[in-house]
């Protein structure tokens, strides 16, 4: 008997990166025969962020007639309580999930081994990941500015501001093609936006860092050099941040953030969607 595959809206919500919610949610939803329309809401740690989330839930409910499924990890009591009052089926990722999803969707779980699964689909994901990694490595640290039309995003920043690890993480975990370009000493003296970037302004995103942290990182690489001096680091950062503001390039400070947090915040700020789940 053919099963009628339904479509359900699914939200992943966290006051952190939401990566844990996504991971557990994907495992659980893989046991149910419906297509998931997924949205991720990381860093829901303020009333403003919560308000935006609740509006999205309300829109989903009114548009589909079904309460969306919300996988969440929230430690702030006030936000958690308000989320639980929303017109949605909410699952704390630390609770038992599968049985509750079964109850709410009125569907019996179907383990992956009992469902048809496309090997080609998994192969496609594998090759997409490899292609993203190869592109990112080929466009690391300004190696080449050719092929920028294929980039999903172009990261800019001073040397040692976190561009390379962030680029590789986004390629490996999200399947995104990321180019990055460092503003080196020669660039800083006459800093301007390169002509090659003009038609890709919508792809540009800046990374900056506290001067003290940058000095510490550079000292570990070239101790005692002008490159690592307090004055040089401060000068470079002030100049590059001025360019970001002047050219209206969005940017974030990476000083206290992990690579996972940097990558997730970039997705949040740009609206980019990950290609791999």
From Swiss-Prot:
What are the disulfide bonds? none
Q: What EC number(s) is this enzyme filed under?
A: 2.7.11.33, 2.7.4.28
- What UniProt keywords are attached to this protein's entry? Kinase, Nucleotide-binding, Serine/threonine-protein kinase, Transferase
Cite the binding residues for ADP. 157-164
The family classification in the record reads: Belongs to the pyruvate, phosphate/water dikinase regulatory protein family. PSRP subfamily.
Role according to the record = Bifunctional serine/threonine kinase and phosphorylase involved in the regulation of the phosphoenolpyruvate synthase (PEPS) by catalyzing its phosphorylation/dephosphorylation.
Entry protein name:
Putative phosphoenolpyruvate synthase regulatory protein
């Amino acid at each position: 008997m053919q099963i009628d595959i339904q479509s359900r809206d699914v939200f992943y919500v966290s006051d952190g990166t939401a990566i844990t919610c996504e991971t557990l949610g994907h495992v659980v939803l893989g046991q149910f025969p419906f297509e998931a329309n997924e949205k991720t809401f990381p860093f829901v740690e303020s009333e403003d962020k919560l308000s935006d989330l609740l509006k999205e839930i309300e829109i989903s409910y009114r548009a589909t007639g079904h309460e969306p499924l919300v996988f969440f990890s929230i430690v702030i009591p006030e936000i958690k309580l308000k989320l639980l009052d929303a017109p949605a089926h909410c699952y704390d990722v630390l609770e038992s999930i599968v049985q509750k999803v079964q109850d709410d969707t009125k569907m019996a779980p179907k383990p992956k081994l009992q469902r048809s699964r496309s090997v080609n689909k998994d192969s496609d994901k594998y090759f997409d990941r490899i292609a993203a990694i190869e592109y990112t490595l080929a466009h690391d640290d300004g190696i080449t500015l050719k092929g920028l039309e294929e980039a999903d995003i172009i990261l800019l920043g001073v040397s040692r501001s976190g561009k390379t690890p962030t680029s590789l993480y986004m390629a490996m975990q999200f399947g995104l093609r990321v180019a990055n370009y460092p503003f080196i000493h020669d660039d800083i003296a006459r800093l301007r936006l390169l002509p090659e970037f003009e038609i890709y302004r919508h792809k540009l995103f800046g990374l900056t860092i506290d001067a003290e942290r940058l000095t510490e990182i550079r000292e570990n690489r070239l101790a005692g050099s002008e490159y690592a001096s307090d004055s040089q680091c401060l000068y470079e950062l002030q100049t590059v941040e001025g360019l970001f503001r002047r050219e209206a390039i969005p940017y974030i400070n990476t000083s206290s953030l992990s690579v996972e947090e940097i990558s997730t915040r970039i997705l949040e700020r740009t609206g980019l969607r990950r290609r791999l789940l």
